[in-house]
Structures are given as structure tokens and as C-alpha cells.
């Protein structure tokens, strides 16, 4: 289950306790959870409508990752991937199919800050704000990487 699916569960009024039960099995087995915090494909129209401060990124959305961290407090690190294409005309699918010759991938291991561990995303406004600030700082680094020349 993706963190986006978790956010959808919560937005439909599902109880966080139910999510914790569902995620309980993840504590016993190795799993990978993918969160696409941008939430959607980048287009110039979406970029302009969001008034994004990042030149090549949409604003990050914190709901999915916030609920995941809330229900899985044993997550202490995240792998952050940033993929830089040599052309704005190509898609992620083109990348997966090997249709691009010049791609840079930045992979970073990021520690989840202590102030974001064992918090309740649904009820703790301070946690939501701190999580947004953390994501924004990660996005600043992504933006710098994407703006560097090939």
C-alpha cells in the first residue's frame, strides 16, 4: 500500500488505529513503501496554478508521508530519489523503457528528524507544519540539483 493510499483512507474518515493494525504486518516483514510527495505529474499549468517556489518541481504534499510516519514510527530513514532528464520532452516512462541517453539520478539516505517520530498527523498541527518544513528543505535541495547543468 502506498502512502497515497493511506492518505485516501484517512481522508475517507478511516481511523488511524485501523491503519496501524493494517501496517502491523509491515513491522514483521521487510517491505518497501513508495511516496510520491509531488502527488502528480509536473506540467507548466500545474506549476503556475500552485505558484510553486521551485523552478522544476511542484510543491510537495505531506499527507501521505505524514500518515505513514504516524502509523509506522519505526521508520527512521528514507531513501530520496531525484531523477534529472536531459530533456523536458521526455517522460518517466521513456526513462523506464531506456529511451534516454543522458539521465542523472541522485539517491540520498535521509534520517527522519526526531521531532517527526511518533507523532499523530491527523491531530497534531505542529507536527504537520514541521513535516512540511522538512519536506520543503528537501525540495530546496532537489531544486538545486535539477537546476545544475548536465
Where are the regions a protein language model picked out?
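Membrane-interfacial amphipathic helices and adjacent loop/beta segments
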Residues: 1-20
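Short amphipathic alpha-helices and their capping/turn segments at secondary-structure boundaries
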Residues: 19-28
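A cross-family acyltransferase "interaction/gating" segment
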Residues: 2, 27-120
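Charge-dense, low-complexity intrinsically disordered segments
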Residues: 9-13, 55, 122-125, 129
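Generic hydrophobic, helix-prone segments enriched in Leu/Val/Ile
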Residues: 19, 75, 95-96, 135, ...
Amino acid at each position: 500500500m502506498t502512502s497515497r493510499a493511506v492518505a485516501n483512507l484517512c481522508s475517507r474518515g478511516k481511523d488511524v488505529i485501523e491503519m496501524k493494525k493494517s501496517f502491523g504486518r509491515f513491522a514483521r516483514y521487510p517491505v518497501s513503501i513508495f511516496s510520491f510527495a509531488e502527488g502528480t505529474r509536473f506540467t507548466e499549468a500545474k506549476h503556475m496554478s500552485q505558484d510553486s517556489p521551485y523552478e522544476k518541481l511542484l510543491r510537495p504534499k505531506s499527507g501521505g508521508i505524514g500518515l505513514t510516519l504516524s502509523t509506522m514510527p519505526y521508520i527512521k530513514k528514507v531513501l530520496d530519489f531525484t531523477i534529472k532528464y536531459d530533456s523536458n520532452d521526455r517522460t518517466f516512462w521513456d526513462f523506464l523503457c531506456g529511451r534516454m541517453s543522458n539521465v542523472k539520478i541522485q539517491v540520498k539516505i535521509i534520517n527522519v528528524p526526531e521531532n517527526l517520530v511518533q507523532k499523530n498527523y491527523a491531530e497534531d498541527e505542529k507536527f504537520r507544519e514541521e513535516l512540511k518544513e522538512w519536506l520543503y528543505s528537501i525540495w530546496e535541495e532537489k531544486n538545486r540539483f535539477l537546476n545544475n547543468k548536465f
